[in-house]
Amino acid sequence: MGRATENMEQYAGLTQAGYDAVKAVYPDALCIVHLDGGCDPKRYQFIFEGLRKYHAKWDMIGLSIYPYWDIEAKLTQSEDETLEKAIANINHLWETYHTPLMIVETGYDADRPEDGKQFMSRLIQAARHQADRHCKGIFYWAPEAEGHYRLGAFRNHRPTAIMDAFKEGGSNKN
C-alpha cells in the first residue's frame, strides 16, 4: 500500500494525508519529503513529479548523502562523484520545484576519521557555496553511534575528527 513504484497516486495520497495531519496540529511546521540516494536525480524526479502530478504538498526536500552507500549501490564510483552529483541534484531540484532543500542524513566511516573530516568539510562547503544557498543545512545521522554502526562519528565514546568539520564550518582546516 502506498508504494510509489506500484501506485504513485496512493503514495501521493499518503504523503498528502501526512502533510495535512501535521499542518492541522502545527500549521507552521515544515514538512520534509526525504529520500535516500541524494546523488540520484532520476529517483528524485520520479518521486517529486509523481507527487506534483497528484497534487501532494511538501515544504522542503530532504536528501541523504552517504558516499559509502552510494558507492555500494553503484550510484557512484567515488566520493568525489557522490559529492558532485548530490550538489548538481540539489541545484536541479531547486530549479525544478523552487523548494528549499536540506541534507537530512549523511555519515562517514568512523574508522577513517581524517578522510571523514575532509569529506564533511567539502560537503559543507559545497552545500554552502555551490548549491546557491538553497541547501538550508546538514544533519549527520547518529554521530554518537559506534560499534555496530560504522557510519557514526564517535569512537570510545568520544567524537572523532569527523565532527571537527562541523565545528570549523567546512573551512578545510587541517
Features from the language model and the residues they span:
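Active-site mouth of glycoside hydrolases
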Residues: 1-6, 35-39
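Aromatic-rich peripheral "rim/lid" segments of glycoside hydrolase catalytic domains that contact
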Residues: 3, 7, 21, 78, ...
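Glycoside hydrolase catalytic-domain groove-lining segments
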Residues: 9, 13, 17-20, 24-31, ...
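Short, well-ordered beta-to-alpha junction loops that form the rim of enzyme active sites
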Residues: 35-37, 106, 143
